[in-house]
Amino acid sequence: CLQDVNHPYRQRIDTDFGGRVEVYNKQQLLNGQNFNPTSVNEQLSILVLSYDSFRSTDKEGRKVYQENSNLAQFTKFYNSNGTFIEDVDETALVQVINQMSPLIVVDESHHAQSNLSIEMLNNLNPCFVLDLTATPKKHSNIITYVDSLQLKKENMVKLPVIVYNRPHVSKIGK
């Protein structure tokens, strides 16, 4: 929805940032399509990526860790005191993102709690991480709460939700 300039979310972001917004997917980033130090400096750059984008189990997933001449111009702007990902080329997309210290929004963050997911997130060197989840962990720093009726009114709940109260944990699933 963020790449659709007619979508209300995108229109709001465009309004808030004076139309200086670019939304990128993984392929656009790898190709350096309108993604360079000047554009990143002059606009809000939103990178829409999934955890799968950084999984290195297949050829496509490894591309974010490989040398990439399309992104070589970013290396001139790296902070020599910055945090670098060991054994990853300085022109690799993941290294470029790491050097930007991005603000990261993790949707459905309760699905991203494995050691590998946390390590991958740390490799991106975020300045801030905002976790979005319907099931926060105990002692989470909850910024806002939206009840299910409000979500239903906003058509945010796509499937019927049926909740049963069980008298004891041993009765779950029965």
Positions of the model-derived regions?
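RecA-like P-loop NTPase motor core of helicase/translocase proteins
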Residues: 1-174
